Amino acid sequence: MGTAKCFIAANFFRRNFMVRERIPACTGAAGLLYYNKTRAHRQMPLPTEYCRKGVPDAPRPADTAMSKCILVINPGSTSTKIAVFRGAEKVFDETLRHSREELAPFHWVMEQVDFRRAVIERALAAHDFDTAQLDGICARGGQLPPCESGTYLVEQRMADYMYTIKHAAHASNLGCVLALELAQPLHIPAFICDPVSVDEMTEEARITGLPEIRRTMLGHALNCRAMARRCAEEVLHKPLEDCRLIVLHLGGGASARLFIGGKMVDGVRDDEWMFAPERFGGASLQPVVRLCYSGKYTEKEMTDFIRGKGGLVAYLGTADAREVEKRIADGDAQAKLIYDGMLYSAARAIGGLAAAADGQVDRVILTGGIAHSKYVAAYLTKKLSFIAPVEIMPGEFELEALAAGACRVLEGQERPKHFALPTAQA
């Protein structure tokens, strides 16, 4: 990495980890709910170590603000990504891949908890890493009810809630349970950061024309917010709260978020206005209703089209954008039509968010794995540059974002948030 980039990266993390407000000391009476495999609920007092490691009892000097050791966990459908950070520095990372044969015995994603925890423990042992060094664990957050952005302390009720999600349960639901089970014997706090269900949408944006259905957010909140924060710090050189940004994440799925005043005030879900390599979206409703009642497909099959078997998979038989671009380079006109159609649908969605921002947008940010493609960058830059300059920030920085979120809490820059059940379920 060049000197300039090193300086920018260091500056970014220094600003994000600086202590800004004191968080009161925790007390043993508060208690910490733990989860065990029998799911027999019990409350254990907060150990002294938790107060020492978990929540600072006094502001830290700025020169110690990057010393916390964090294990981060990002569970996906066929892999679990882990990394250990000491402040902003990544000590090591690894993608633990799970074969179809390994996952075959599990009929529901939450049945994989013991399997994935064992895989993580073996990987840490293989790196000869002493978990006693850890100050906290932060995992990708799952399908919680709509919530604010931020870093959440993982408590028993959050882990329990993941077990109530039976329909279309996502692998991210494993994150908080894995973090809590690994943190329990170490007496350190477990966190999640910017879960997929972050929803700060304005009320007028929720109206659909049918009272029974309100728009909600769902998508790549963690990476979108990380890229928005990074663009604000490194490109615009001002706080995220002072920026107006649109972030488009393009991966196996696609979603977009509009940031105003530091909040995600509107967005496009991965099942809404655009389609993606594995997602169906952007269709008129009447044909969808007719297909649902045609008798041709079950509810599960229709749901699979929305996430998993739609998009490029349905048209071209593959979700691999690199393969599709190779077909285009080889003269496959159908592949070009479908691929361009996917990018067109994304550009159209971004245009809608720009209108929601009154046309006042500082940057449009392209991120996710597909943003590595020069073809994609050129197509979308041409379509979107009339709105605002387009920043290409490819890849995913979810591991870094998880570590940064935990550090901001552990160093006293932010207060941890607490999960609350929806009123109807409390």
Summary of predicted features, one role per range:
Residues 70-111, 270:
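Short glycine-rich, Thr/Ser-proximal phosphate-binding strand/loop in the N-terminal lobe
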Residues 94-132, 156-158, 162-167:
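N-terminal phosphate-binding loop and adjacent alpha-helix
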Residues 124-171, 189, 197-209:
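Short beta-strand-loop/turn "lid" adjacent to the catalytic site in phosphate-handling enzymes
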Residues 174-181, 192, 207, 212-244, ...:
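Glycine-rich phosphate-binding loop plus the immediately following alpha-helix
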Residues 304-359:
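Adenine-nucleotide phosphate-binding core of ATP-dependent small-molecule kinases
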Residues 361-380:
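Glycine-rich phosphate-binding loops at beta-strand->alpha-helix junctions
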Residues 374, 378-404:
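Conserved phosphate-binding/catalytic loops in two-lobed NTP-binding clefts
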Residues 394-426:
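Structural signal for terminal/edge beta-strands and the immediately following C-terminal loop/tail
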